[in-house]
């Protein structure tokens, strides 16, 4: 009997010792996260008053404090942390060692920041016998700061130098606004948007998957007209084989009031004249400046191609050749289907036709012999110079 009683008392002691009868929750100890503060003189900006975003990045300093679960400084903490950005990139020192729960006056150089961003600090550790650092899940973020809003020229003109010159804002969701923008072409699957007044990197493809429609005070929606002014557009920046696009966008046209009804504001005079790219076809850096823009190549003829090749069978892509031997691909299947590229192939004893080809400049890094592709808007963009 004494043994049973002793066992019962011992069991009760264990239960009490484990806290199961007290209603108390286990107490978390150690590092919970970090407080990240900017230098006192750093201007966070606001949605109404945005700070400048210089080409070399926004340079300032931060202070990092380790915090416990009680949200108080954890002065006995030592460890390694990495300093990055929520969206952009920190090009200053990215990994430091914290001692006594604090690291102060740490320089950050914040690049590729648009609209708003934050500095992110996370703890990292190396597993025994390994060289790579892994995050532990303990993080901290700075207050939000507001930089210049996204523009087409910023998205297209800020690149990271890899094949196809991808945008530095790849995979970011951004809103284009505060610039005058006009629709320069509507092609099945999307439309091309131009930033009025921008000379280079001025246009981008808005991939809508299907023909873009708008509601212009009519009973049924209508296809987005060329020349429509766009007030703002939101979408995710995506690199499709080197071609920068904004995927599945929402967009807001500019409307005007006419006789008590709202109508789309259309101004085709804002569509820029096509850029002659004949002299820069082999200069990828220069061609990048005109991606998704209206361009033209003059006095070209259809070069020989294998009509059984998948690039022609599946995508109707064929090469054009200039008088000095430069190449650019063309695609006419959807927009100018009456152009018979096969009939224009060079043959022995046959005099080739010469054309001025105008259209939208696309890029596909697997296309050959050129990764650049010219897509006419319609048959009017193909001018034969010597057809009878």
Show the residue positions of the predicted features.
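N-terminal cationic leader/targeting segments used for protein routing and processing
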Residues: 3-4, 127, 171, 266
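Positively charged n-region of N-terminal signal peptides that target proteins for export
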Residues: 1-4, 19
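Sec-dependent N-terminal signal peptides
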Residues: 6-9
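Core sequence-specific DNA-binding domains of diverse transcription factors
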Residues: 19-148
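C-terminal motif of bacterial Sec signal peptides marking the signal peptidase cleavage site
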Residues: 14-17
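OB-fold nucleic-acid-binding modules
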Residues: 24-27, 35-54, 134-388
């Amino acid at each position: 009997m004494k043994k049973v009683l002793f066992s019962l008392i011992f069991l009760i002691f264990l239960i009490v010792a484990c806290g199961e009868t007290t209603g108390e929750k286990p107490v978390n100890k150690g590092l919970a996260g970090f407080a990240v503060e900017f230098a006192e003189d750093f201007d966070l900006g606001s949605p109404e008053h945005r700070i400048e975003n210089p080409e070399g990045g926004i340079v300032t300093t931060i202070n990092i404090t380790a915090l416990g679960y009680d949200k108080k400084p954890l002065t006995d903490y030592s460890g390694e942390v990495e300093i990055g950005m929520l969206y952009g990139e920190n090009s200053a020192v990215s990994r430091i060692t914290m001692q006594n729960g604090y690291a102060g006056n740490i320089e950050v150089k914040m690049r590729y920041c648009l609209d708003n961003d934050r500095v992110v600090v996370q703890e990292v550790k190396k597993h025994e016998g390994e060289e790579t650092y892994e995050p532990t899940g303990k993080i901290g973020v700075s207050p939000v700061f507001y930089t210049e809003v996204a523009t087409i020229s910023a998205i297209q003109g800020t690149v990271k130098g890899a094949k196809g010159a991808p945008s530095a804002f790849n995979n970011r969701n951004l809103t284009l606004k505060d610039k005058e923008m006009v629709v320069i072409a509507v092609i099945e699957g999307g439309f091309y948007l131009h930033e009025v007044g921008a000379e280079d990197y001025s246009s981008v493809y808005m991939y809508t998957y299907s023909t873009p429609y708008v509601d212009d005070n009519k009973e049924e929606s209508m296809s987005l007209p060329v020349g429509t002014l766009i007030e703002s557009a939101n979408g995710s920046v995506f690199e499709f084989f080197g071609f920068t696009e904004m995927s599945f966008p929402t967009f807001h046209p500019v409307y005007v009031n006419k006789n008590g009804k709202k109508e789309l504001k259309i101004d085709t005079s804002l569509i820029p004249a096509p850029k002659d790219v004949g002299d820069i076809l082999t200069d990828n850096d220069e061609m990048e400046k005109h991606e998704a823009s209206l361009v033209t190549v003059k006095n070209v003829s259809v070069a020989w191609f294998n009509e059984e090749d998948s690039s022609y069978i599946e995508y109707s892509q064929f090469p054009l050749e200039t008088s000095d031997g430069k190449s650019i691909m063309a695609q006419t299947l959807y927009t100018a289907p009456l152009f018979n590229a096969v009939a224009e192939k060079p043959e022995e004893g046959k005099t080739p036709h010469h054309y001025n080809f105008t259209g939208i400049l696309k890029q596909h890094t697997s296309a050959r012999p050129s990764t650049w592709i010219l897509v006419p808007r319609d048959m009017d963009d193909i001018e034969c110079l010597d057809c009878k």
